[in-house]
C-alpha cells in the first residue's frame, strides 16, 4: 500500500497543485491509515472493507481525535481509494457508504479593534527586529493574508506606488490585495532601511528576514505573535490566523461586500467567508438602535 500512497501524493502535488502544508496533512493521515492496516495484517488494498475502516476510525476517536480531524481523515482516505480505483490499483472502494461526522465550524477568538491596536503597538520600533515585527503585524492585519503567504512574499510582490500586494495562496492561486496608508509607511521604511540591515551578505528576494538574513519560518512568526500578545495583555487565544480572522470580521462588521472579502482572503468557496458574518451582540444592538424606526 505504501507504493500506492506515494503515487497518490505525487498525483495531488502535480495534478492538483496543492500546497506542501496540505500534502503534509494528507501524508500524516495516510500514514495513520497504513499503520493501522499493517497492524491488522492487511497486505493488499482490496482486503480493506468498510467495517475495518470504521474500526480504524473508532481507534482514532479513542486516541482523542476531534470530529474535525476525523472528517478530514475520512476525506483523505476517500480521495485515496478513488485514486486507487481510477489507476487500477484496486477493484473496489470501501469508503463509498462511509459517513463523515458533523462538526461545528467555529472561528478562533477574534480581536476587537482596541486589542488589534494594542498588539500592533507592542514591538519596540527602536530595534531592527521590533520594526520588522511591527511591519509584519501591520501587513497581516491590513491584508488578511495567511502566515504561510507572508513568509513567501518577495520584494517584487509589493507595489508601494500603486498600493497593493500580490499574494500567492493555496495551489499558487494569485490575488491582488490593496494596502492602506499606515502599512505602506511601515513597508517603505522596512524595505529602504531595516531590511538591508537584516540582509547582510545574503542574496534573497524574500521580503521578511530573520537576524541572520534568512527567511523567517511559520513557527518564528507564530512565536512572535504569541509573545507580543502576552506583552499587550491580550487574554484571548492567539493563533497565526488571529489577525486574518480579525481582518475579515472587522471589514464585514463595517459593511464590506462579502464577495470582496472573499476575494481578498483568497477563498474559493464563499461559504468559507460566510463564517465571518457572525456579528457581536453589541454590534447587533448598535445596528438595531441605528436603523429600526421604533428603537
Curated annotation (Swiss-Prot):
One of its GO terms (biological process) is cell division. Its main location: cytoplasm. Residues 106-289 form the Tyr recombinase domain. Coiled coil: none annotated. SUPFAM superfamilies: DNA breaking-rejoining enzymes. GO terms for molecular function: DNA binding; tyrosine-based site-specific recombinase activity. InterPro entries: CB (IPR044068), DNA_brk_join_enz (IPR011010), Integrase-like_cat_sf (IPR013762), Integrase_catalytic (IPR002104), Integrase_recombinase_N (IPR010998), Integrase_SAM-like_N (IPR004107), Recomb_XerD (IPR011932), Tyrosine_recombinase_XerC/XerD (IPR023009). Belongs to the 'phage' integrase family. XerD subfamily. HAMAP family: Recomb_XerC_XerD, Recomb_XerD. This is Tyrosine recombinase XerD. It comes from Staphylococcus aureus (strain Mu50 / ATCC 700699). The lineage of its organism: Bacteria, Bacillati, Bacillota, Bacilli, Bacillales. The gene is xerD.
Amino acid at each position: 500500500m505504501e507504493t500506492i500512497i506515494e503515487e497518490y501524493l505525487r498525483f495531488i502535488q502535480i495534478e492538483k497543485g496543492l500546497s506542501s502544508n496540505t500534502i503534509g496533512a494528507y501524508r500524516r493521515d495516510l500514514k495513520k491509515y497504513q499503520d493501522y492496516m499493517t497492524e491488522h495484517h492487511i497486505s493488499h488494498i482490496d482486503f480493506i472493507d468498510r467495517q475495518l475502516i470504521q474500526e480504524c476510525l473508532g481507534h482514532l476517536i479513542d486516541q482523542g481525535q476531534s470530529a474535525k480531524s476525523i472528517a478530514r481523515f475520512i476525506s483523505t482516505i476517500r480521495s485515496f481509494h478513488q485514486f486507487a480505483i481510477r489507476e487500477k490499483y484496486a477493484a473496489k472502494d470501501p469508503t463509498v457508504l462511509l459517513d463523515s461526522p458533523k462538526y461545528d465550524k467555529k472561528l478562533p477568538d477574534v480581536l476587537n479593534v482596541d486589542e488589534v491596536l494594542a498588539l500592533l503597538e507592542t514591538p519596540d520600533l527602536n530595534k531592527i527586529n521590533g520594526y520588522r515585527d511591527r511591519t509584519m503585524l501591520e501587513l497581516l492585519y491590513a491584508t488578511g493574508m495567511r502566515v504561510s503567504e507572508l513568509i513567501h512574499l518577495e520584494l517584487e510582490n509589493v507595489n508601494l506606488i500603486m498600493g497593493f500586494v500580490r499574494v500567492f495562496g493555496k495551489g499558487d492561486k494569485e490575488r491582488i490585495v490593496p494596502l492602506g496608508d499606515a502599512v505602506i509607511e511601515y513597508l517603505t521604511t522596512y524595505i529602504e532601511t531595516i531590511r538591508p540591515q537584516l540582509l547582510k551578505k545574503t542574496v534573497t528576494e524574500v521580503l521578511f528576514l530573520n537576524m541572520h538574513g534568512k527567511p523567517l519560518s511559520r513557527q518564528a512568526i507564530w512565536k512572535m505573535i504569541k509573545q507580543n500578545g502576552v506583552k499587550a495583555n491580550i487574554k484571548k487565544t492567539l493563533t497565526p490566523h488571529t489577525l486574518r480572522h480579525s481582518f475579515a470580521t472587522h471589514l464585514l462588521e463595517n459593511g464590506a461586500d462579502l464577495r470582496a472579502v472573499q476575494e481578498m482572503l483568497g477563498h474559493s468557496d464563499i461559504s468559507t467567508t460566510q463564517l465571518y458574518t457572525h456579528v457581536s451582540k453589541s454590534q447587533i444592538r448598535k445596528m438595531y438602535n441605528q436603523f429600526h424606526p421604533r428603537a
